[in-house]
Amino acid sequence: MTDILNYTKSEEIFSAAQELMPGGVSSPVRAFKSVGGQPIVFDRVKGPFAWDIDGNRYIDYIGSWGPAICGHAHPEVITALHEAIEKGTSFGAPCVLENKLAEMVIDAVPSVEMVRFVNSGTEACMAVLRLMRAFTGRDKVIKFDGCYHGHADMFLVKAGSGVATLGLPDSPGVPRTTTANTLTAPYNDLEAVKKLFSENPDAISGVILEPIVGNAGFITPEPGFLEGLRELTTENGSLLVFDEVMTGFRISYGGAQEKFGVTPDLTTLGKVIGGGLPVGAYGGKKEIMSMVAPAGPVYQAGTLSGNPLAMTAGIKTLELLKQEGTYDKLDSLTSRLIEGIIQSAENNGIAINGGSVSAMFGFFLCDGPVRNFNEAKTNDAELFGKLHREMLRRGIYLAPSPFEAGFTSLAHSEEEIDKTIEAFDESFNEIKK
């Protein structure tokens, strides 16, 4: 494949950015700290491709970190947004589009009987934690090592995503009193969860988790794990919360809860439901959601929540995803991709394990299996950095961290998958030397 070597404009712009913004970025993982090399400054995106400011084209497997499941700048989404923006960018008042997207979410997601829109996944998780505590009258919450639920103080305990990427301890500036009620357990370890319930009787409001971990790499639930959490929370009078900001509408139309047949009490959403615009949501049983203001006493608000542009993009995206054969195509393409990646590594004598579920995939450069965050950290970080740089030179844009899942879209074709596997063949051959 043709090597990309010219990053002159990206270098200039990123250098200037470091004088203007902390680290030169608006979100830490974009700085390429864990992989080295030159952060790329994008100019435009379309379909499965991204172009940088120097004119280099990449096959993109980040997809704006998950929202672009239909491909970047899908023409139907763009047309709908053009029509919507003529009416104004934000109303700060009720909007019929909120009703329509709410109906679509409620119809699709098994646990959701009522939904509240916010502006990000972090907001959704902050609000859902407050709601859990209010509904149960309990303060403690269980989260899992490596699972990421946004950057709110109470979740920055053994967190994934950028916290894991940068190898940071629990963040400075977060008082111990804030996280004193946050309990942690290894993902896929039911016994550890049982122990926490035993040690904290009648004190745990609920358990929150990514049903498929996407922010500590790509880690799937062991058989019986999600079912076991459902049983444990019910037995202990606690709530089960699925953070489906990443998996919602990505691994099936009804998310992970539909895919695995386990229904939580509450769900957080984001990414896909905004069609590429800032959005978040949380929802669940009416009995619980009726506690949210102004219907109930649990306060939460937002200036741009439910804005017409995000609602428009979300509605059109879900309409596209609901078409027949959508997830069969995503399953097939992504399976082909990860199988090719694994085969390429094995052909070059490089330890690897990985997998995919529909339009979400990931791999670790280590002996497997990887069932939790501690095992994920056995990934060969130095080798992954070399791989990332080699793939970038060949026009393949992967997440610049081993602790982030990858994403395919409906815009990817077999041609892009084949070119990507070819690039992996060449890159693995290069880094094994």
Curated annotation (Swiss-Prot):
Q: Where in the cell is it found?
A: Cytoplasm
Quote the catalytic activity from the record.
(S)-4-amino-5-oxopentanoate = 5-aminolevulinate
One of its Pfam families is Aminotran_3
Sorted UniProt keywords: Chlorophyll biosynthesis, Cytoplasm, Isomerase, Porphyrin biosynthesis, Pyridoxal phosphate
Which residues are recorded with the post-translational modification N6-(pyridoxal phosphate)lysine?
A: 271
Q: Which cofactor does it need?
A: pyridoxal 5'-phosphate
User: Which pathway features in its UniProt record?
Assistant: Porphyrin-containing compound metabolism; protoporphyrin-IX biosynthesis; 5-aminolevulinate from L-glutamyl-tRNA(Glu): step 2/2; Porphyrin-containing compound metabolism; chlorophyll biosynthesis
NCBIfam families with a match to the protein in the record: hemL (TIGR00713), PRK00062.1 (NF000818)
Please identify the protein, giving its name as recorded: Glutamate-1-semialdehyde 2,1-aminomutase
Q: What is the lineage of its organism?
A: Bacteria, Bacillati, Cyanobacteriota, Cyanophyceae, Synechococcales
Encoding gene per record: hemL
